Swiss-Prot record:
Gene name for this UniProt entry: glnE
Catalytic activity: [glutamine synthetase]-O(4)-(5'-adenylyl)-L-tyrosine + phosphate = [glutamine synthetase]-L-tyrosine + ADP; [glutamine synthetase]-L-tyrosine + ATP = [glutamine synthetase]-O(4)-(5'-adenylyl)-L-tyrosine + diphosphate
Protein name, UniProt field: Bifunctional glutamine synthetase adenylyltransferase/adenylyl-removing enzyme
Family indicated by similarity: Belongs to the GlnE family.
Signal peptide stretch: none
Biological process, per Gene Ontology: regulation of glutamine family amino acid metabolic process
A GO MF label: ATP binding
Originating organism: Mycobacterium tuberculosis (strain CDC 1551 / Oshkosh)
Length: 994
């Protein structure tokens, strides 16, 4: 008879699948340990404990290895695991979290006993004594010393990791991150003490060792160390002694072999500096040479081993300099450089996985906290603490950041540091890189090791992904708020609760540290923005922290903030404006860059604000590039044609031109356009305005019979003719007319002249927009000649009287507006003059060379620097353009492709025809592009035409950024400009034969 067991009598042992074991041999391994045969509660509890290990399969594999080692005492360990819940929690969590500690246990199988019972970590002093005793006990056994020290250090890490991880498996106390980090620093101190003892014995023998103090820096100095980290140190000596460097070097060698890498690169002069300096030498260096980052590093300095009294003297001497660092002349520039360097360190392909250097990562928190300490600890000693968590608490308590923000930032920081610890424990390797999000197994392991559990909607891996997103976003937002929110509160409405720390003086210091040269003025602008009545003030209070942060990265935050205030006041009634900045961060960030770089574009945006809405990206890319210059030109001409009144027509044309200039300038500043595209777009809009003005003036000036007495064409000269206008270029033109049938030349010229004069006057009317000046001085006889000539008059003049400079000027002549057929006939007529069948005469070439030499000596403005004048300076625009034009005059009769008004296109032809070596042509091209970018950038930055690059300083930095230089280092930009133009000048001299 078959007896069916009751459900309560069925085997209690969970299956391999229920335990989460996925390795195919998992069942065999359980059988090998004998854990699959006993159905008592102890074995059930044991198996469920194993299942909770972060990686149960890894833990099981390590247990098999332990069981196979005869030195383990497996029977004792097995019995203990069945009886002792705390041992299970510690051992299984370690084996499931750390392959490296599993290897350590297998190599030292008796070390599992360190995890039994009531585990108490030794104190700092006990730990140091035990490591030093290990050294003393090993005297006479030098071969085993490093091994014994490494084993002792790993045993301590094993104990600490077991206590840290146990709560992931059993209901054990959670060890706070700050305690773990401090205990790791204690171990590092003890390890350094042991290494120093070994080094002193090795170098000094029986003689007294030199007085050395070892100063821990970085995370070790702040007692917030990682499981795996380089330990940064600085060595200080009482006096010069040849043994100092030998002891220090030996100490680093021993420590690196037994424990961890020891790095002394934070010492004065870095790796190029002396390894050991006297205290006096340290003081002299920090007084004269130290950079801001070196003072920032000293925030974490802590004497750890060696001569304690000397270490304290080191701190006493140097820390006052740290608290005065924000007063240094280069403080702001160096802080800005440090902020950018942090962002540029991370390769783009792993930026989203970087715990330390990625956006919203650990370095964001640490940098923000340290900068606030440097700014405010000068006057508040409560901020003079080393650890990031302690500093956040002190900043919150002192009112320098909101208390809730301090608590949230601390929570995010500790969460990210916890993940960093878990990642490093796995193989005891230094890493800050999260697993690939697609690696489900690795993400699940990390989640379990960090004690993250399913939440009902997501499994542990899903919860970790969501938590990481949340924490990164929170850190990014808080990173901005830490700097700016307390500033806004300090200037907010009366009665707002502000802690005592954030006085107006402290607020000014913080703004100065963030790059504002006029912090008190900046505070006034901020106050005006946030203290508006109603919704606008509230929205500005929410927006400003992030906007101010973005603006602080621009070359001129002060000018940017003023421009933002003016723009906000001008658009106060436009509801879309603040809504766009609030809802579209990309638009807001780009706008802050533009406002903080340019004086030219903000003025345009105030009267063409809808361009701001084009700062976002569309499906095909940036909306600023969706507009075609040709379409703008057609719309502008059509718009003007709707008005019979010339003034209203030109006002309409100005409106569209203003919008187009704002679009071009914005796209240029944001790096969306090449310089040649900028020049073509600027030329296109100028030509459209000219065509619109000519059309409307002709319509308004028709006689009663509505028949124009003459056809009129406008010939573009100079950069207008070459379609290479810059923001500050003149528009050089000539007017040509042809009488209508039955109209004599005199009447046609008189009528056409009145049209030309009225067009010039109408366009030249003073306006808040960039000027629309027409320059007709390149016409025959210059200012003394008639403004308008007939085609026949031009032909007669050029045939009889054309001077070499006039022939040269005609090389850029191009029909740009008016009667197209007349314009083309004019060009065919002047082709005989500018491209004569036999080339220009040798006398003409000599005359052009003479004129160029005279221009170089006479036309450069008084006081201008010939090396940095973009137009007339060495290797500048005039040099390149005159060189191209000389080659056109000499060779255009043989090379038809040189019948071209564009400098860049003509350079291509010169290279293709091998008139000048290709390498030399490339030097000319780069100089023209560099000078054109610089000249355009000067107008964008200063808001008015200018050709002279400024000297070193904020304005040159802004020009560098506006010109598309890779950073805001004006010095680098200027060096490149000088190098490029110097090389081009050598080519110019070769071509001109001088």
């Amino acid at each position: 008879m078959v007896v069916t067991k009751l459900a309560t009598q069925r085997p209690k042992l969970p299956s391999v699948g229920r335990l989460g074991l996925v390795d195919p041999p998992a069942g065999e391994r359980l059988a090998q340990l004998g854990w699959d045969r006993h159905e008592d509660q102890a074995h059930v509890d044991l198996l469920w404990s194993l299942s909770r290990a972060p990686d149960a399969d890894a833990a099981l594999r390590a247990l098999i290895r332990l069981s196979e080692n005869p030195d383990t005492g497996w029977d004792e360990l097995n019995a203990a695991l069945l009886r002792e819940r705390s041992l299970r929690g510690r051992l299984f969590s370690v084996l499931g979290s750390s392959l490296a500690l599993g290897d350590h246990l297998v190599a030292h199988p008796q070390s599992w006993k360190l995890l039994r019972g009531k585990v108490t970590l030794p104190s700092h002093d006990q730990l140091q004594r035990s490591f030093v005793e290990c050294v003393e006990e090993s005297e006479g056994m030098p071969g085993s010393l490093v091994h014994r020290l490494r084993t002792q250090y790993r045993d301590y890490v094993l104990m600490l990791a077991a206590l840290d991880l146990a709560a992931t498996v059993e209901d054990e106390p959670v060890l706070p991150f700050t305690v773990v980090a401090a205990r790791l620093a204690d171990a590092a101190d003890a390890a350094l003490a042991a290494a120093l003892r070994v080094a002193e014995a090795s170098v000094c023998g029986e003689h007294p060792p030199p007085r050395l103090a070892v100063i821990a820096m970085g995370k070790c100095g702040a007692r917030e160390l990682n499981y795996v980290s380089d330990v940064d140190v600085i060595f200080v000596a009482e006096r010069s002694d040849p043994r100092n460097a030998r002891v220090a070097s030996e100490m680093m060698r021993v420590a690196s072999a037994a424990f961890f890498e020891v790095d002394a690169a934070l010492r004065p002069e870095g790796r190029n500096g002396e390894l050991v300096r006297t205290l006096e030498s340290h003081i002299a260096y920090y007084q004269r040479w130290a950079k801001t980052w070196e003072f920032q590093a000293l925030l974490k300095a802590r004497p750890v081993v060696g001569d304690a009294e000397l270490g304290e003297r080191y701190l006493t001497a140097l820390m006052p300099m740290v608290w005065r660092a924000c007063e240094r002349e280069d403080f702001v520039v160096e802080v800005q450089a440090m902020r950018r360097r942090v962002e540029q360190l991370v390769p783009a392909d792993v930026r989203g996985r970087e715990l330390k250097l990625g956006s919203g990562g650990l370095r964001d928190v640490e940098f923000a906290v340290q900068l606030l300490q440097l700014v405010h600890a000068r006057s508040d000693e409560s901020l003079r603490v080393a650890s990031t968590v302690d500093a956040l608490a002190a900043l919150g308590e002192g009112g320098y950041i909101g208390r809730e923000d301090a608590a949230n930032m601390t929570a995010s920081y500790e969460f990210l540091r916890l993940l960093e610890h878990r990642l490093q424990l796995q193989r005891l390797k230094r890493t800050h890189l999260l697993p690939d999000p697609e690696d489900e197994e690795a993400v699940r392991w990390l989640a379990r090791a960090a004690h993250i559990r399913p939440d009902g909607r997501n499994d542990a891996a899903g919860v970790l992904r969501e938590e990481l997103k949340k924490q990164n976003v929170r850190v990014s937002k808080l990173h901005t708020k830490l700097f700016y929110q307390p500033l806004l509160e300090s200037i907010g409405p009366t009665g707002l609760e502000i802690a005592h720390g954030m006085t107006l003086e402290a607020a000014g210091r913080r703004l100065a540290a963030l790059g504002y040269e006029g912090p008190q003025t900046a505070l006034k602008h901020m106050s005006a923005l946030v203290n508006q009545s109603g919704r606008r003030g509230r929205v500005q209070s929410v927006l400003l922290p992030r906007l101010l942060d973005w603006m602080s990265y621009a070359p001129d935050p002060d000018g940017g903030l003023l421009a933002y205030r003016r723009l906000s006041e001008a658009l106060a009634t436009e509801s879309w404006y603040l809504a766009t900045l609030r809802d579209k961060p990309a638009v807001a960030k780009r706008l802050m860059h533009v406002l903080g770089t340019s004086a030219y574009v903000p003025d345009l945006l105030m009267r063409a604000p809808r361009v701001i809405q084009q700062y976002e990206d569309g499906p095909a890319g940036p909306k600023l590039l969706e507009t075609e210059p040709a379409a703008v030109a057609r719309a502008l001409i059509a718009s003007a044609s709707r008005y019979p009144d010339p003034e209203r027509a030109i006002a309409g044309a100005r409106t569209l031109r203003r919008r187009e200039l704002a679009r071009i300038g914005s796209a240029d500043l944001l790096g969306l356009l090449e310089v040649s595209e900028v020049c073509r777009a600027l030329t296109s809009v100028w030509v459209a305005v000219l065509q619109a003005a000519l059309d409307v003036m002709i319509r308004a000036s028709l006689p009663d019979d509505d028949r124009a007495p003459a056809a009129i064409a406008v010939i573009g000269m100079g950069r207008l003719g070459g379609a290479e206008l810059g923001y500050g270029s003149d528009a050089d033109v000539m007017f040509v007319c042809e009488p209508a049938t039955g109209v004599d030349d005199a009447r046609a010229v008189k009528w056409s002249t009145s049209i030309a004069e009225r067009v010039r006057a109408l366009l030249g009317t003073p306006s808040v927009d960039p000027p629309l000046e027409l320059d007709a001085n390149l016409r025959p006889e210059g200012r003394n000649g008639p403004l308008v000539r007939t085609l026949g008059s031009y032909a007669a003049y050029y045939e009889q009287w054309a001077q070499p400079w006039e022939i040269q000027a005609l090389l850029r002549a191009h029909a740009v507006a008016g009667d197209a057929e007349l314009g083309q006939r004019f060009l065919r007529m002047v082709d005989k003059t500018r491209y004569p069948p036999d080339g220009v005469s040798a006398d003409s070439v000599r005359e052009i060379r003479r004129i160029k030499a005279r221009i170089e000596s006479e036309r450069l403005p008084r006081g201008a620097d010939p090396n940095t004048h973009t137009k007339l300076g060495r290797g500048g625009l005039a040099d390149i353009e005159w060189t191209v034009q000389l080659l056109q005059l000499q060779h255009a009769h043989q090379v038809p492709a040189l019948h071209n008004t564009s400098t860049l296109q003509s350079l291509d032809v010169i290279a293709a025809a091998d008139l000048v070596p290709a390498a030399d042509v490339e030097l000319l091209r780069q100089a023209w592009l560099t000078a054109t970018r610089a000249r355009n950038a000067l107008v964008l930055v200063r808001g008015k035409p200018t050709d002279q690059l400024p000297g070193p300083g904020r304005q040159l930095n802004a020009v560098a950024v506006a010109a598309g230089w890779r950073n805001d280092d004006g010095g680098e930009f200027l060096d490149n400009y000088l190098r490029v133009t110097r090389r081009a000048k050598a080519v110019v001299r070769k071509v001109f034969g001088s």
